[in-house]
Amino acid sequence: EHNTQMTLLAGENKLPDVFWLEQATAKEFAQNGYLSDLTDALDQYGINDSLLPGLVHSCTVDGKDVGMPSEVMMVGFYYNKDLFQQAGIEEVPVTYEEFLDVVDKLNAAGITPLTVGAQDNYSIWAFETMLARYGFFEKLDGLKDGSISWNNEDFIHYFEKVEEMREKGTFTKDISNIGYFEAKEQFLGGNAAMFNSGAWDIGDFEGSDMASKIGFFWGPTFSDSQYEQQIGIKASGGVYVVSSKAAEDPALLDAIMQFWQFYYGEEGTRIIAEDTAALPCSTYNGQIDESQHPVLSTMITALNDDWKAVTEPFNSLSSNVAYGYFDATFGVMTGVYTPEQAADYVENLQSAER
């Protein structure tokens, strides 16, 4: 709905001065001339100097900065420490084989392993990391120019893993009938051991009765992939953008840049980390009280680990192909698609754009 409204305003030349967009939409807006090229202004005001390394130049078109990170897009699997303990799970899984062992133990204990809701097709964030471990970014140029098909051996392996998860009873039985918010309620209610989500849920989890019981891990690695495995999505999600019209006013652009200097600077970063229990986009040198903010502390530890930061595959695809990939993955989760059918579905969408 927000994207639709912004598209209508763009057509009427009535866009706000500063506004938020998903990255894929922001890139489309920039290509249509609706957004300002921020490259020189960001350099002049030194704003990029404050950002986390994985967030610098996080939204570019033809090498030009067109957006600034609004949040840290950090995704993976949250888990309930108590339910893991009840099932006799002593170590957080790292490999896919260890992940399936966790699923088996949870099922044996009568505990739903992973809650996820197919009614909201965008809610497969941790699975995007899995796709990246099968070489998504290495194949991206080929996917776009047609030299590589979505129906390739690595992506078939990805979809086969999702299929095997379904066959093993990984997903909540009502997956087809619930969405993201219902899945989150199941997790917070102690009715599922794992939940696929991201940093935006820190606030809700911190305010819950089970805050101290929540852990986090990046999701399984795969021995049948030749690509980098120790990677995690630690990048920009949506972005703040400046309309082309606003950038024509030097005083207005100066005011925007001065605000961003504060927002992404030391004081703004402190406010975000300490007062909102969110992950800041800039380097935070303070100390989080783990007893008061156990989930935030857990996430900051993961953010600062030595796993390589990558962006969300969604940000590198058109909206149509990205949502098609979401549908394909949920299609395999629910048994509607075979791995080959899922890959062909996304390939048909991608080929229409070549």
Question: Which positions does each model-derived feature cover?
Answer:
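Hinge/lid segment of periplasmic solute-binding proteins
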Residues: Q23-G76, L100, L106, A126-E128, ...
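Extracytoplasmic/periplasmic solute-binding protein
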Residues: K64-S70, V75, L100-S147, A192
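Glycine-centered hinge/linker elements that transmit conformational signals in sensory
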Residues: V103-K105, D145-I175
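Extracytoplasmic/periplasmic substrate-recognition and gating elements
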Residues: A87, K168, G207-D275
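C-terminal capping/gating helix-and-loop segments adjacent to ligand/active sites or protein-protein/ligand interfaces
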Residues: E1, T60, A278-N285, S297-Q350
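A structural signal for short loop-to-beta-strand junctions that line the ligand-binding cleft
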Residues: L8-L9, K14-D17, I47-L83, T112-A118, ...
